[in-house]
Amino acid sequence: MITQAQLYHGWMQSEELQHLTASEPLTLEEEYSMQQSWLHDANKCTFIIIEKQEFKRSGNEIGSMVGDTNLFLQEPEDSQSAEIEIMIAEEKARGKKYGWEATLLMLCYGCEVLGIKKFQAKIGLDNVKSISMFSKMGFNKVSESNIFQEVTMERIVDNGWKTWLLEQTQGSEQVKD
């Protein structure tokens, strides 16, 4: 049976995903090492995105994975700020709002559990779908880098936005391990 690291490693061989995530390809050993370091790093938070119907059908967590979403907590001097990322790696899962739902759930988790007050997303300039999604979530463009070919978007957490987030995620299901 394939491991989570092996599946992720396979995804990250895609030049498209490397471009969209600004990632370099890793060896399988490096992938295992990175996943172990993330597991023990208190400044990183990852949710694995599982396609619910596939999981119900197969009972296979790894085979049901379609992507992930991450929070990178900023250094201690700015502990109420985090960078958010989203990746729907499985092509067949794109365009089904999984990224939307997973991002909203991660934002809620960041607000409710971690006390995050400001979120930031760094997105490739040509990733129009992600820029549009974060705009619809109330993020605003704060900078653009032609050198890094990315736009930085931010959202300050306020009561109105937090209420909107909670309304958007009503009925969503988080599976805790």
Describe each model-derived feature in a short phrase.
Residues W100, L114, L125-S143:
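Conserved active-site alpha-helix within GNAT-family acetyltransferase domains
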Residues E90-K96, L125-D126:
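Active-site acidic-Proline motif in GNAT/NAT acetyltransferases
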Residues S81, G110-G124:
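Conserved GNAT acetyl-CoA-binding A-motif
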Residues A93, K97-M106:
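Conserved acetyl-CoA pyrophosphate-binding loop and the N-cap/start of the following alpha-helix
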Residues M1-A93, V113, N140-D177:
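GNAT-family acyltransferases
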